[in-house]
Amino acid sequence: MSENLRSQVVTQGVQRSPNRAMLRAVGFKDEDFNKAIVGIANGYSTITPCNMGINQLAQRAEAGIKTAGAMPQIFGTITISDGISMGTEGMKYSLVSREVIADSIETACTGQSMDGVLAIGGCDKNMPGAMLAIARMNIPAIFVYGGTIKPGHYNGRDLTVVSSFEAVGQYSAGKIDDKELLEVESRACPGAGSCGGMFTANTMSSAFEAMGMSLPYSSTMAAEDAEKADSTEKSAFVLVEAIKKQILPRQIITRKSIENAISVIMAVGGSTNAVLHFLAIARAANVELTLDDFETIRARVPVLCDLKPSGKYVATDLHKAGGIPQVMKMLLAHGLLHGDSLTISGQTIAEILADIPEEPSANQDVIRAWNNPMYAQGHLAILRGNLATEGAVAKITGVKKPVITGPARVFESEEASLDAILAGKIQAGDILVIRYEGPKGGPGMREMLAPTSAIIGAGLGDAVGLITDGRFSGGTYGMVVGHVAPEAAVGGAIALVEEGDSITIDAPARLLQLNISEEELARRRANWQPPAPRYTKGVLAKYAKLVSSSSIGAVTDLDLF
C-alpha cells in the first residue's frame, strides 16, 4: 500500500511541479516525494511551564520520523495557560482554545494533505483539542504528552500550583503570613511540565494512554526526564508504522476504548473536565456517549490511586509505582476493561498488559491494593434534579459527608464569589451559586479554582457547597458541582435561584435540588429575561453563538446545517 495516500495529491504529476518546488525549499529531495508526509502539531510555548519543553520533543519526533522513512513537517498550534488565566477574564478563552487547537490542527493537516500527524501538547486544552482534530480527520495519528512537572517542596511536603491557590485562602484567613505565602509561590512550580497532581492535563494524558492513542507509560513521565524525549521518538516510529498499516483513529477511538478511558479516569481520581472532553471526543469519532454512561462506569469502578488534589501524591509518584499500565492491569483483571481494544501500535490492550502484575507492589502506597481502595466507587457523579434537568457533574472528594442542604449565596460571576469568600462573608453550611459562567453565558465556561481553593484554604472545604454552570479545575476538590445544565444564560433553573433559597446537594442520591415548589419555580421562570450578550464581536461572541450545552460536550459544530 502506498504510504503517501493523501500527500500524493501535492507531490505527484506534472501539474504539481510548483508544489514540489516549494517543498524542495523546506528540504525535500527527489527521493522524498514518494514518502509519507507526517505533521508534527507542536504546542511549544513559553506562555506556560506546561508547554515550554515541547520544542525539544518536536525535534526528537522530527528526527524519529525521518529515520523511520517519512517526511516530517512541524507546524505550531496555540495554548492558553489555565493556571495563569485562572480567576481572570482570560479564563473565558480556555475552553475556547480547545476548539481553536482542534480547528488549527485539522486545518493544517487537511490543508496540506498530510498522511498522518503526531500531536504534542501540555496544558489542559491541548489534549482534547488535539484529539478532537484527530477523531474528525481520521488519519493515522498519535498523541505525545509534553510531560508532567516535578513537585515543589516546602516544609517537608510536596507542592503543586494548587498549593499556591490554597495559600491565598490560608493567607486571607490569617493562617499564614507574607513570608510563607511567598515561599509557597516561589517553590510550587520548579520547572517544565504540566501541573503535577491528577489535574486535567494528567487526567487527559492518562485517559489517552488508556484509550490506546499514546504509548504505554508515556502519560506519567516527567517533562524534564530523558525518558520523555525517548518515548517521543519511539512514538514517531510507531506512527510511521501505523501509516504503513493504515491504522486509523476511529479503529482505536471506539465505544470500548472510551469506556476503558473513563474507567481509568475514575480509578486515578481524575478531573471533572474529562467528562466534558470525552463527550466531545466521542461525538467527533461518531461514538454514542452520554452523561449516563459516566454514571454507569462510576458505579462499578473504585478509586485506586491516592493522588492530589484531594490525595497525597503526584503523577511522578504514580509513574514510579507502575504508572497507568499497572492501574489498567488491575481493572482488566477484575473485568473492568475491554482487553480486545486496539491501540496505535497494532497491539490490543490485553497484549500490552500481558506482563504486568495484577496487583501493585507492596512497597508503595500510591496505587492501593484492590481490596483497599481510596473509595469503593468512582468520584465523578452525575447529579440531576430540578436544578439540573440535563445533568451536572459532581466531584465529591476530600469531604466527610457528601450531603448538604443549606441557604443559597448567589453570585453572578466568579469574581464576586471570590471577593465574598476572601472577605469572610461565607459561613459553614452555605451553598455558593456561581452562575452565568456556562458555555454561552460566560462565555467560555470558566474554571472555578480560585473560589474553591479559597474555600479550602479558609478551612471550609467540609462545610460549604458550591454549584455552578461553569467548570472546575482538575485541582479542585470538596463539595462541588459544576457543568449545571441547562445553564443560566439559556434560562436554566440555576438562573432562577434567589439569595437564601434552600438547596440540597446529595451525591449518594445523585440529586441537585432547589427546595421550592413547582409553582414558585414556574412563576420565576415566567418572569426571567435573558441577559444581553457580554460580547458582540470577536472569538467569544462567535463561541457563544455556536457552543452547545455542557451536557453534550460544549461542542461548536452541532446542528450547523
Curated annotation (Swiss-Prot):
Amino-acid positions noted as binding Mg(2+) in the UniProt annotation, renumbered to this chain: D82, D124, K125, E447
PROSITE patterns reported for this sequence: ILVD_EDD_1, ILVD_EDD_2
Cofactor info, note text: Binds 1 [2Fe-2S] cluster per subunit. This cluster acts as a Lewis acid cofactor.
Catalytic activity line of the entry: (2R)-2,3-dihydroxy-3-methylbutanoate = 3-methyl-2-oxobutanoate + H2O; (2R,3R)-2,3-dihydroxy-3-methylpentanoate = (S)-3-methyl-2-oxopentanoate + H2O
N6-carboxylysine modifications at: K125
EC id: 4.2.1.9
Keywords annotated in UniProt: 2Fe-2S, Amino-acid biosynthesis, Branched-chain amino acid biosynthesis, Iron, Iron-sulfur, Lyase, Magnesium, Metal-binding
Chain's role: Functions in the biosynthesis of branched-chain amino acids. Catalyzes the dehydration of (2R,3R)-2,3-dihydroxy-3-methylpentanoate (2,3-dihydroxy-3-methylvalerate) into 2-oxo-3-methylpentanoate (2-oxo-3-methylvalerate) and of (2R)-2,3-dihydroxy-3-methylbutanoate (2,3-dihydroxyisovalerate) into 2-oxo-3-methylbutanoate (2-oxoisovalerate), the penultimate precursor to L-isoleucine and L-valine, respectively.
Protein name: Dihydroxy-acid dehydratase
Name of the gene this protein is made from: ilvD
